């Protein structure tokens, strides 16, 4: 039985064979107390000074976030690293595809480090290059000269970003997906969207595209499990991928929140299933959720459909509001949770000793077209800035 990503929503998502594996954390870090680990992290940071920058994703545990120089979403953080050209090492407290993106945007003189190589992303691993290339061949054999534009979500491997770059496509984030799809439809008749079906479906529906024009592509079936006529009728072809955390949210949870808190404002991430997004008051990226709470009048009540670490941090930072997670069962991103303070201390102390461990490096043959896809996205909608942060500014 293969190892699994973690508890809760992730329990049925086996780690694909190609996902990275992490060596055992040295025993001294396993045995160290929390206080000792935090002391060692601080001391290593002080020793390294400007030679290192630590990036912390919104979904990281607080014990890690407190040491981050920047806190934000994956693309904000990758771009934030560019503001520290003097940093020889970029330590990305996130997951594998995020570190890859940081490597794409960093200089040749900088090393990108992922403290725990086992911090992958089940959704990103649901679309691999071989399967996407096979899908592409099947679709282009049907569509002929009709232009098909590939769009990959930021939550994908560098190899897939390179694929879309080579095929006239583009990368999107959860905050700019609509603008990116509009860009794609200015250039082609159809879009192949991967790996997250829910973000693609929710975005296309908001643009007025019918559900019958959004067939799901299952890479394990001929023609993705569709008929030729269904594919010919398609406008957006959705890859059979999903986020293990966000698929947990349900309309029943929203109804329960409204029954208990009549004035509640329900915000969900667009990686949630379509019925959940439809039933919510608003949906948006992690940055959207943070800003909505920051701007709300005191005494507001929010039920939030996203990862629990972010929700709990917001509840602690904004005690003037009532903030809770839609899912009553704790729903962490279990792979993000693999970045334990012990791994961060280990990575930093190895840097102090002159050793670079767990380096994430994208080959130039992949990086060059992947950068093209990212640059196309930036030409459509520039990335929102992220400011330097203490642990408070997540």
Swiss-Prot record:
It is found in: Cytoplasm. Iminosuccinate binds at residues 57, 74, 153-155, 174, 269-271, 286. Binds 1 [4Fe-4S] cluster per subunit. GO terms for biological process: 'de novo' NAD biosynthetic process from L-aspartate. Its cofactor is [4Fe-4S] cluster. Gene3D superfamilies: NadA-like. It holds the Pfam family NadA. GO terms for molecular function: 4 iron, 4 sulfur cluster binding; metal ion binding; quinolinate synthetase A activity. It catalyses: iminosuccinate + dihydroxyacetone phosphate = quinolinate + phosphate + 2 H2O + H(+). GO terms for cellular component: cytosol. Catalyzes the condensation of iminoaspartate with dihydroxyacetone phosphate to form quinolinate. PANTHER family: QUINOLINATE SYNTHASE, CHLOROPLASTIC, QUINOLINATE SYNTHETASE A. This is Quinolinate synthase. It comes from Corynebacterium glutamicum (strain ATCC 13032 / DSM 20300 / JCM 1318 / BCRC 11384 / CCUG 27702 / LMG 3730 / NBRC 12168 / NCIMB 10025 / NRRL B-2784 / 534).
């Amino acid at each position: 039985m293969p190892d699994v990503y973690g508890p809760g929503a992730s329990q049925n998502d086996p780690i694909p064979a190609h996902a990275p594996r992490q060596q055992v954390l040295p025993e001294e870090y396993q045995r160290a107390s929390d206080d000792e680990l935090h002391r060692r992290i601080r001391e290593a940071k002080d020793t390294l000074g400007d030679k290192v920058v630590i990036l912390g994703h919104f979904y990281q545990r607080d014990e890690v976030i407190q040491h981050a120089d920047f806190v934000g979403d994956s693309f904000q953080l990758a771009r934030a690293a560019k503001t520290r050209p003097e940093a020889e090492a970029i330590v990305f407290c996130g997951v594998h595809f995020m570190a890859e993106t940081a490597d794409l945007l960093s200089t040749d003189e900088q090393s990108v480090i992922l403290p725990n190589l086992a911090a992958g992303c089940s959704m990103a691993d649901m679309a691999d290059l071989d399967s996407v290339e096979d899908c592409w061949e099947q679709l282009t054999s049907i569509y002929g000269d009709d232009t098909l534009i590939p769009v990959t979500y930021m939550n994908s491997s560098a190899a897939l970003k390179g694929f879309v770059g080579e095929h006239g496509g583009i990368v999107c984030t959860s905050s700019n997906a609509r603008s990116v799809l509009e860009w794609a439809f200015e250039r082609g008749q159809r879009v192949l969207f991967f790996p997250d079906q829910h973000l693609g479906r929710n975005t296309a529906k908001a643009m007025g595209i019918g559900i019958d024009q959004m067939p799901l592509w299952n890479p394990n079936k001929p023609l993705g499990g569709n008929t030729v006529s269904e594919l010919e009728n398609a406008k957006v072809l959705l890859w059979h991928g999903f986020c293990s955390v966000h698929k947990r949210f349900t309309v029943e949870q929203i109804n329960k929140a409204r029954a208990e808190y009549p004035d509640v404002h329900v915000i969900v991430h667009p990686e949630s299933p379509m019925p959940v997004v439809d039933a919510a008051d608003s949906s948006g990226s992690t940055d959207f959720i943070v800003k909505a709470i920051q701007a709300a009048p005191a005494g507001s009540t929010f039920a939030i459909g996203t990862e629990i670490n972010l929700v709990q941090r917001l509840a602690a930072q904004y005690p003037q509001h009532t903030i809770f997670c839609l899912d009553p069962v704790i729903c962490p991103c279990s792979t993000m949770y693999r970045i334990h303070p012990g791994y961060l201390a280990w990575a930093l102390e190895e840097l102090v000793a002159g050793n670079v461990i767990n380096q994430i490096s994208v080959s130039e043959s992949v990086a060059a077209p992947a950068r093209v896809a990212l640059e196309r996205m930036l030409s459509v909608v520039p990335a929102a800035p992220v400011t330097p942060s203490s642990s408070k500014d997540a």
